[in-house]
Design a protein with these regions (language model features):
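Active-site-adjacent loop/helix surface patches within enzyme catalytic domains
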Residues: 1-133
């Protein structure tokens, strides 16, 4: 089940140009308690210069940014310019964040990590069906 808890900081309030796919990351925060709620609090505080649409842990999935808005999760166009997949999905000189939904998996040490993966698969399936990807 997805719970919507939209952030007001670290959110550009800019519409995606076109939804072309989903990018899955992990938070790289393995500390105890680094679940989706902890990341919601982190990204809704000071300016972090990054964000994602969804945070998934072993118990919940939080949506922080609407699917049709930009989140800062992929990096910028210059850093990713040499990736072959980039030229297929992102126009030259544009930013990949304008085209992808970002999902962050919370793989903290006290999480059931198999459950995190299962919840992520469920979310991706729902999003692919919803957006006909």
């Amino acid at each position: 089940m997805i719970t919507q808890k939209l952030i007001t900081k670290n959110r550009p309030y800019k519409k995606l140009k076109e939804l072309r796919g989903i990018v899955i990351h992990w938070t790289a925060n393995v500390r105890k308690g680094a679940n989706s709620q902890a990341h919601y609090l982190y990204f809704n505080a000071a300016n972090r210069s990054s964000s994602a649409h969804y945070f998934v842990d072993d118990k919940s999935t939080l949506q922080l940014i609407p699917d049709d808005e930009v989140a800062w999760h992929v990096g910028d166009a210059i850093k990713l310019a040499s990736l072959p997949i980039r030229s297929k999905y992102v126009p030259k000189g544009d930013n990949p964040n304008n085209y992808f939904i970002g999902i962050e998996m919370c793989m903290n040490e006290d999480a059931d990590q198999k459950r995190v993966l299962d919840n992520t698969v469920q979310l991706v399936t729902e999003l692919m069906l919803k957006h006909k990807l």
